[in-house]
Amino acid sequence: LERGMGILDDEIKKIDKVLPGEVAFKLYDTYGFPLDLTEDILKNKSLGLDHDKFHKLMKDSKELAKKNWKGSGDSSVDEIWFGIKDKIGSTEFLGYESNQAEGVILSLIKNNKQSENLKEGDEGMMILNQTPFYAESGGQVGDLGTISNGKNIFKVSDIQKKLGNLFVHYGSLKTGSIKVGDAVELKIDIERRANLKAYHSATHLLHESLRRTLGKHVMQKGSLVAPDRLRFDFSHMKPITNEELETIDKLVNDYVKNNTEVTTRIMTPKAAIEKGALAFFGEKYGEEVRVVSMGKEKEAYFSTELCGGTHVKNTGDIGKFKTVSQSSIAAGVRRVEALRD
């Protein structure tokens, strides 16, 4: 909400009487900024809003989401997400800065239907206004942890994103009962997150080390960032020699020993790519992207990629790195697996 408020303040300075519907839609769809809050702020400043444009963009967005939605194969479950997204909008992700947060339960799902409550022993899904839990994406698995209200404890076993930025917490209620509207405390498994951050940052260093050792034709084709290992798929036509593997490991470990800062910036995709950031998979990016860099800017970053994952603050937090296997998974695509101490 803080970022959305800043954007709204900047846009208000540019207008005379009416805020463009495109701005209100971006605030709602990208930052989870409620429309009624935008309206209240505008009203207090005697300003209006282009509601027609906002609602047209909402309609177009819903139609596009339904067109592109692959779903689970269960139409009754899939339809739920559209109804929830229409009602509550996007979930605000706090996990880049926080390991825990307070939130409000906006929706509960039990037995593939929306429910007003969960009782002890129930398995279900929970959606809140905000969360520090990272949802599985970009190869990085989701966080685990707990969501609680006093002695009422919901154990999170998985977290996925639906329809863009709707964070769905899967799990079971271990004790007590909870209901829609409850204020709760969200806590991720900090040790597990620390391992995920280290492996994700190691993946970036591995990617750049592969490119520097094998050639610039190396491009990421897939990855798995788990709390106990990493797997990296990339374009390359032949097996990596033992000498090349030693060089790759040395490059990664040298950068770990340098303990250089890991920085993140928010930029437009065009500006990021002009700065040398790598983008992958032919992905479609929004108006703003998160750029993760390792190294010193004045000396040219060692690694710069577009990435929405979580990362260490300094490369020294990664620990010793070692590739443990390589294999061919398709024509022209190889896989490397690695561990860290």
PLM ranges: what are they?
Residues 1-341:
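A glycine- and charged-residue-rich anion-binding loop/surface
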